[in-house]
């Protein structure tokens, strides 16, 4: 009897040990179809697409901070602009013959229309709620002074009238008219100063953090979606079947687990480069990153806030990168209006606002150090600009503000440190390395891992960027009738251009404006503002662009 009891006891212990081992393994390794690294707007947007396209796929999102949308997607860490080239002068460069190129502006505007359609669709599905909580109508204006700049803006306005996307834009050189549009900018200004402005009523202010939170909250309603906060990726390893084993550390209790994923998206903002390098895919060797931060002056004084309802962008100074141009913006943050002015560039070796001072050094490798050196040597003007920005005093920043708000008072403003942006440096066969404006989707040949690098125009074009990723990584599925039908339901204009089609442009703007609660009046015929004869430009070295 004792032998039987002992044998049963041994079997029980053995079975219990097997059970415990199985549980330990389960806790150590989790399986998922899609792993989203980073709790920002890019991961949230991709997850939302995939939820409609493949509702049965399991998804896991990991975020190193204690909440989602706390880095670059956070409303206070970016300019909150719905970038559509209505006012951003860097998207319409002047050619050597003096003409204005609008190709980039058209592309940026087309991209933002996709974002508007994506958000409108999510509102109709109940994924996004209360549109005013994340998007509001704020007119977009360009404002310049000086004869050459006025001539440029007049020519830009005339050139943009060739596109159906920019109908409704108005132009004026009249002080009284511009004061009506933006009183804060004009009051106290020299009445003899030569000025010009354009204004488009359908501009927007967007809280990308709120969009991110709402998208992820909707994803969490499904049992096959898991969100893990305070979770940092420590390693990525490709398996023999082309899946990935990703080691994730719990920053609260120090434990680690492995997540086995069929597809991995690295949407970790500034940290994406280091994680892409960690993956070991050969495509990562072509890239390096350079971090640039931004500061804004902020006013919450009702006397200032209630006197300004516009986003007003100027023209970059000679020698400064185009995206460095100051702008004075109406924002809607935390449910109330504020006014921001900036940005002022800052420098830190961190790749994230909540990153490590070792980020830049640890991302430097034998394969990307030379491209970084070439970019530094070839963009000395940019280096000088960044140094000059870092050296700015409080008085310097206030004087810059007064160029756009002549009657500004120091006591109405405080300085705010916004997010970090990691600019793309890419290996180039001719130049060794080039600084790239924009974003790039980098993926392996097998389509099992992809990362988003870059900073501008960023969040405002999350929907088209993730659409591009789907086409690049899931090409066969995208071409299937099922995915085509779903994508066209999400983005009605998918697969065709709005530019040049007045009826289609007006139809989409009307639809998205109604759903998102935005102002939209059918544009009238453009005015007869004459196009000036611009002088040919001296051939100059192109100034590298950056995003702040």
UniProtKB/Swiss-Prot annotation:
InterPro entries: FAD/NAD-bd_sf, MQO. Its cofactor is FAD. SUPFAM superfamilies: FAD/NAD(P)-binding domain (SSF51905). Keywords: FAD, Flavoprotein, Oxidoreductase, Tricarboxylic acid cycle. Its EC number is 1.1.5.4. HAMAP family: MQO. This is Probable malate:quinone oxidoreductase. It comes from Escherichia coli O6:K15:H31 (strain 536 / UPEC). The lineage of its organism: Bacteria, Pseudomonadati, Pseudomonadota, Gammaproteobacteria, Enterobacterales.
